[in-house]
Amino acid sequence: PIDEKELIENVDLLFHCAANVRFDLTLKEATNFNLYGTHRVLKLAEKMQKLQVFVHVSTAYCHCTEQELEERYYPASENPFGVMEMVKHLSDDTLKLITPKLLNGMPNTYAYTKGLTEDLVHSYHTKFPIAIARPSIVVASWKEPLPGFVEGMNGPTGLIIGAAKG
């Protein structure tokens, strides 16, 4: 197994593709997966001695309120660090009450937290080079890098499996 020391000393290209893509998560759940998870990877990247670039895989839908999505940085409607602190300290009931106002037109907590995550990643651009990719769709892998690497029936995967089964 690779340990943190080996990563810090040897990684020069880091792809961060992990996220919870469920659309029905509470704000706390989506924040814990998408924001805190990315923040932990960014903190590790900060220590990497040979890092040339940090590539964050986002989604084309994290700025779905825009008429046209350009290849540029979009500031989030809220400070991602502030949202992380708020989620840590507020009760689930309070968060449930304020979530619709925070989403501010976003369709779900996934899109909202992915937009915040882009802002979080951007906040590290003075520490190391970053790139943000916004694919419109992500599907499960069949064999590579190993079977089951991407699990779940989210997005088009369920549709494809359903169509294949008839």
Stretches found by the model and what they are:
Residues P1-I2, K96-L97, E118:
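A generic local structural motif
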Residues P1-L13:
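Conserved Rossmann-fold cofactor-binding substructure of NAD(P)-dependent oxidoreductases
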Residues I2-K5, N20, L44, V121:
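Short, flexible, glycine/charge-rich loop motifs used to bind or transfer phosphoryl groups or to couple energy/partner
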Residues D12-A19, I161-K165:
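Amphipathic, well-packed alpha-helical segments that form the structural scaffold of globular domains
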Residues L13-C17, D24-N32, Y36-Y112, S123, ...:
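Conserved Rossmann-fold NAD(P)-dependent oxidoreductase catalytic core, especially the SDR/UDP-sugar
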Residues L146-G166:
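C-terminal beta-strand-loop-alpha-helix "lid" module of Rossmann-like NAD(P)-dependent dehydrogenases
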